[in-house]
């Protein structure tokens, strides 16, 4: 019993630490206080790292997560801050977990085509109603969110994407579930 309680306290402490870090980061991004360390980054590698980290952190058995490359062998590079881009993907994956306590299948797909890199995170969870999806697709709505059901994590995602010159689209997947597609300008390595 003591071990179970200690584990619960540890997990809650990690969650609180993560929330404080997200709050600090979103404030820094909002007021342009967060330096963006721009370098050529491989979004395929960042996607693999984000999925591996979630799997290695003890993903509960009611969740499945998979990673795939849209076009294997084709570079998916952009100019950006690797740590922030990884944080963005981590937030999207964890958003699927938090909002689907019954479990779900999560798919992370990365690729490049037509001068753009794309990161897509989908789940077959409970999804969202059409009005909320439409509101999330309005940057002002997400940027003005002050916490709430889909608040700080998605606000942080929007801010990271905006800082990298990207776009975000939220959509319904299948009969239920959520899909988020993020695109960035591709970095030409020629």
Model feature map: region roles:
Residues 11-16:
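Short alpha-helical segment of the dimerization/phosphotransfer core of two-component systems
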Residues 31-36, 75-80:
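Conserved micro-motifs of the catalytic ATP-binding
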Residues 37-52:
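A conserved beta-strand-to-alpha-helix junction within the catalytic ATP-binding
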Residues 57-68:
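Short conserved segments within the C-terminal catalytic ATPase subdomain
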Residues 96-97:
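Short helix-loop "hinge" at the ATP-lid/N-box region of the Bergerat-fold HATPase_c
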Residues 128-141:
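Short conserved segment of the HATPase_c
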